[in-house]
Amino acid sequence: MAIKIMIADDHSMIREGLKSLLELEGDIQVVAEAEDGVDCLEKLKICTPDVLLLDINMPRKNGLEVLQTLKSSKSKIKVLVLTVHNEV
């Protein structure tokens, strides 16, 4: 049975790149993508992935706020936090 993954990141190029890499594996299926935290939580109402790849820095609702919502709802979804931090 395939592992169901959702990708939540505000950069479409990152979502597409992760999806392409993950789908090279035969036992992984990307079941949903979200462009921000609000979109992520809405899609989680209709889709239950095994794993959520979650960016921290997103508009409207950031990844930490999404994590708090998942924690308060006692979600069983495993979350892997991915983020980019640029230093000058």
Regions found by a protein language model. Give the residues of each.
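Conserved sequence signature across two-component system core domains
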Residues: 8-9, 34, 52
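Receiver (REC) domain active-site loop signature in two-component systems and cognate sites
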Residues: 58
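Short amphipathic alpha-helix used as the core "switch/output" element in two-component signaling
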Residues: 42, 64-76
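Active-site residues of response regulator receiver
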Residues: 9, 55, 83
